[in-house]
């Protein structure tokens, strides 16, 4: 009963805040918000600024290796299970796939900034 009441309150409060944000938008543009800031970007222009594809590829590579760390971090605790061979084989396959991907990126010169 308590969980149902908490869910009902959360949903009601969320819907109330969403409807207030939808029906009461800020219609006037202040001069401070209309001026460019820091880097000189126009705040009223399109939000989709062009970016370097090489930067995107390096960022994706970083995320993949960050995911590798997140997947391999629990290995010391997983050693306590009975099927240690299966766990180590899975970790070895994961590291091998990521190393092959890194080698492929390196060979294709995807990690270099110069054109």
UniProtKB/Swiss-Prot annotation:
GO terms for biological process: mitochondrial electron transport, NADH to ubiquinone. It comes from the Eukaryota. GO terms for cellular component: mitochondrial inner membrane; NADH dehydrogenase complex. GO terms for molecular function: NADH dehydrogenase (ubiquinone) activity. The chain crosses the membrane at residues 4-24, 55-75, 87-107. It is found in: Mitochondrion inner membrane. Pfam families: Oxidored_q4 (PF00507). The keyword Nuclease does not apply. Its EC number is 7.1.1.2. It is an enzyme of class 7 (translocase). Keywords: Electron transport, Membrane, Mitochondrion, Mitochondrion inner membrane, NAD, Respiratory chain, Translocase, Transmembrane, Transmembrane helix, Transport, Ubiquinone. It catalyses: a ubiquinone + NADH + 5 H(+)(in) = a ubiquinol + NAD(+) + 4 H(+)(out). It is a multi-pass membrane protein. Belongs to the complex I subunit 3 family. Core subunit of the mitochondrial membrane respiratory chain NADH dehydrogenase (Complex I) which catalyzes electron transfer from NADH through the respiratory chain, using ubiquinone as an electron acceptor. Essential for the catalytic activity of complex I. Core subunit of respiratory chain NADH dehydrogenase (Complex I) which is composed of 45 different subunits. Interacts with TMEM186. Interacts with TMEM242. This is NADH-ubiquinone oxidoreductase chain 3. The lineage of its organism: Eukaryota, Metazoa, Chordata, Craniata, Vertebrata. The gene is MT-ND3.
């Amino acid at each position: 009963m308590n969980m149902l009441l908490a869910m009902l309150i959360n949903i009601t409060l969320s819907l109330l805040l969403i409807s207030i944000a939808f029906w009461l938008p800020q219609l006037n543009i202040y001069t401070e918000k209309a001026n460019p800031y820091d880097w000189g970007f126009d705040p009223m222009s399109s939000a989709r600024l062009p970016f370097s594809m090489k930067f995107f590829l390096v960022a994706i590579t970083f995320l993949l290796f960050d995911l590798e760390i997140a997947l391999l971090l629990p290995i010391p605790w997983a050693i306590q299970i009975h099927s240690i061979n299966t766990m180590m084989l899975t970790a070895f396959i994961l590291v091998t796939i990521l190393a092959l991907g890194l080698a492929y990126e390196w060979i294709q010169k995807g990690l270099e900034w110069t054109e």
